[in-house]
């Protein structure tokens, strides 16, 4: 299943672009589902139809859905929430506050992600279009699998090797202790979520099937936010294959007020084409009316894609590469707008940590690099090059053997 994720600053028109893309995919014979994770629920407005928590048929080959995160939360997290609510209330926390405390930050978005796996596994759809929340929320959403993976592994091991073996003996010793032991269904729910989260990460970073498309306006704040988004998306291994600049004024516009805005847009458009190169940049005009309903979306879709299939890979270069040159093995990350001063790199075990500002990426290293310290990272031609010297690995191995002797 081809997965296209659209994101951008609030108000740039990403819902219209997402809906139009889905319409075009369906016209080309792809069984398409467009799914909105934006709590604003603009997708209903775009199609001019009331959408629910399950797929609604729009036309042939096209279904749409607006996720209700609280419904998914209750379905997937109820047993865990029930247990922690009981524990918090035993400590004197009020019922409503106890319920709220059981929901971890990002948990609502997490269950929106789990739907991706569900719809992929059904085999009912050839394409999934994700209409996401504004950029900041989307980055938080897409980085959840990486951000939580280390903690989840730790919790899972605690459950497996400590909680489960000791729960029955301890519960027999004291009723009070038994009260705090999580029930089996709560432990199983946590395990299931952890396993599915790892699967979601694999699906979204499958650079053959999944790509992200950035929607922006030719305005300074929109451009800056999109630049940051591109850097962090590449950091987490998501392939971006297209940039769409929306709401551009007609080049023939010559009225005083709009003429000034047109000049501003043209100035920023040049910066966008230069800065985001070699990504393809699609320019989309400002319409003289709202883009609402299937007919309007069909027109908009033709302006975006023409005769091109939206499922095509518009730019095909992976955001992470492993390159070997002699005894030097390089991990290369595409970080087009990163500030080298903000980059920190270190290795723990078989994991390479790359941190930019408050965003962190964990990359599992090949076995051949395990135990090696990275050399000095170099930022060159929009790529971060992190070298590992394989010759030093041999030296480390010989030293260990000597110490054993």
From Swiss-Prot:
ATP binds at residues 8-15. Transmembrane segments: none annotated. It comes from Prosthecochloris vibrioformis. Pfam families: ArsA_ATPase, ArsA_HSP20. Keywords: Arsenical resistance, ATP-binding, Nucleotide-binding, Translocase. Its EC number is 7.3.2.7. It catalyses: arsenite(in) + ATP + H2O = arsenite(out) + ADP + phosphate + H(+). The keyword RNA-binding does not apply. Gene3D superfamilies: 2.60.40.790, P-loop containing nucleotide triphosphate hydrolases. Anion-transporting ATPase. Catalyzes the extrusion of arsenite. Belongs to the arsA ATPase family. This is Putative arsenical pump-driving ATPase. One of its GO terms (molecular function) is ATP binding.
């Amino acid at each position: 299943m081809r997965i296209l994720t659209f994101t951008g600053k609030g108000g740039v028109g990403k819902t219209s672009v997402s809906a139009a893309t889905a319409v075009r995919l369906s016209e080309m014979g792809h069984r398409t589902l467009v799914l909105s994770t934006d709590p604003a629920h603009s997708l209903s407005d775009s199609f001019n139809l009331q959408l629910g928590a399950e797929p609604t048929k729009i036309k042939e080959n096209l279904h749409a859905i607006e996720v209700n995160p609280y419904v998914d939360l209750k379905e997937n997290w109820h047993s865990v929430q029930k247990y922690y609510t009981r524990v918090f209330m035993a400590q004197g926390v009020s019922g409503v506050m106890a319920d709220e405390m059981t929901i971890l930050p990002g948990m609502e978005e997490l269950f929106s992600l789990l739907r991706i796996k569900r719809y992929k596994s059904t085999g009912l759809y050839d394409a999934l279009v994700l209409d996401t929340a504004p950029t900041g929320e989307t980055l938080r959403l897409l980085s959840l699998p990486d951000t939580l993976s280390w903690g989840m592994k730790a919790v899972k091991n605690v459950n497996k090797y400590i909680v489960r073996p000791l729960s029955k003996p301890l519960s027999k010793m004291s009723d009070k202790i038994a009260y705090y032991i999580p029930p089996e269904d709560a432990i199983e729910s946590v395990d299931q979520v952890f396993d599915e989260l790892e699967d979601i990460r694999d699906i979204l970073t499958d650079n053959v099937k999944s790509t992200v498309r950035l929607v922006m306006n030719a305005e300074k704040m929109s451009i800056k936010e999109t630049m940051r988004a591109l850097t962090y998306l590449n950091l987490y291994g998501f392939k971006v294959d297209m940039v769409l600049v929306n709401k551009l004024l007609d080049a023939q516009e010559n009225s005083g007020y709009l003429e000034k805005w047109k000049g501003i847009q043209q100035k920023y458009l040049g910066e966008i084409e230069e800065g985001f190169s070699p990504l393809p940049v699609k320019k989309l005009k400002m319409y003289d009316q709202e883009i609402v309903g299937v007919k309007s979306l069909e027109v908009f879709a033709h302006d975006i894609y023409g005769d091109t299939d939206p499922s095509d890979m518009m730019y095909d270069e992976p955001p992470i590469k492993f390159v070997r040159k002699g005894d030097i093995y390089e991990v290369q990350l595409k970080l087009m707008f990163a500030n080298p001063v903000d980059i920190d790199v270190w290795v723990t075990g078989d994991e390479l940590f790359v941190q930019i500002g408050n965003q962190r990426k964990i990359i599992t290293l090949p076995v051949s690099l395990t135990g090696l310290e990275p050399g000095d990272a170099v930022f060159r031609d929009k790529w971060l090059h992190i070298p590992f010297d394989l010759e030093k690995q041999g030296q480390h191995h010989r030293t260990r053997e000597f110490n054993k002797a």
